[in-house]
């Protein structure tokens, strides 16, 4: 496999329902695997260590990862812009993802 900077292939618009757990997906092709995946909301890095509202999971693939941000009991203020930033030893990529409330399109 060729090594290269990370490349995010997720869509820039994702959807979720108010009151439920909403998942925002950051699908990344990255060889070597990412050293870091960072989620940003309102210009601040989401601190998973201190947050009960946000968590994440990561599924490793041979050529990258799928990193999913989980938002517990999503409220009106949770919809809007998120940023997924991915770093590996070859470079960086980022994607602005707009989370849209289902039924509000």
Q: Where do the PLM segments sit?
A:
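Immunoglobulin-superfamily
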Residues: 1-105
